[in-house]
Amino acid sequence: MSNKYSLNDDELQLFRTSITGTKKLRQDTYTHKPLRRKIGELPAKRALQEQVDASFYFSDEFQPQLDAEGPTRYVRPGASHYELKKLRRGDYSPELFLDLHGLTQLQAKQELGALLAACRREHVYCACVMHGHGKHILKQQTPLWLAQHPDVLAFHQAPKEFGGNAALLVLVALEAPSLE
């Protein structure tokens, strides 16, 4: 890139004579150490811990009792069955989507935990989990895992526009579950 204000020889000589006898300044800028840890580190650690905590509830040993007839559905005891009906009709539209295609069971558990933690953190009431068809491993396991989590109020097979029988709509409790 060319300098648009280039100096001719006379101007350059004038500049050099005007600065003769001057000394170059020593760098006097001081860089202070940060008082606190970097802000970006703490939320990443907190998010990872939330994900681990949320996936703690998912067990392959425990088999909750789910209805085998009809579409995949579940409502937590004490929660309103009307919420399940609204899920089925498509009254709720999910704000967060999770695609489990191509994940292993362990990865799927971690992602489900992260989704539920994100729902709580972002105050999202409805989310969509797309487990797909595949070999039916995640299709069978996903409802079992979701039924074990205390933050899940209900879930139902998603309407066609959100994935049909290859996805679930999940209602998440935003406040802490009551221990009655």
UniProtKB/Swiss-Prot annotation:
Q: Which SUPFAM superfamilies match?
A: SMR domain-like
Q: Which InterPro entries match?
A: Smr_dom, Smr_dom_sf, SmrB-like
**Pfam families this protein is in?**
Smr
Keyword rRNA-binding listed: yes
Per its UniProt record, what PROSITE patterns does this chain match? SMR (PS50828)
Q: GO terms for molecular function, please?
A: RNA endonuclease activity; rRNA binding
Q: Name one GO biological process term.
A: rescue of stalled ribosome
Its biological function?
Acts as a ribosome collision sensor. Detects stalled/collided disomes (pairs of ribosomes where the leading ribosome is stalled and a second ribosome has collided with it) and endonucleolytically cleaves mRNA at the 5' boundary of the stalled ribosome. Stalled/collided disomes form a new interface (primarily via the 30S subunits) that binds SmrB. Cleaved mRNA becomes available for tmRNA ligation, leading to ribosomal subunit dissociation and rescue of stalled ribosomes.
Q: Summarize subunit and interaction data from the UniProt record for this chain.
A: Associates with collided ribosomes, but not with correctly translating polysomes.
Its name, as the record gives it, is: Ribosome rescue factor SmrB
- Organism expressing this protein natively: Pectobacterium carotovorum subsp. carotovorum (strain PC1)
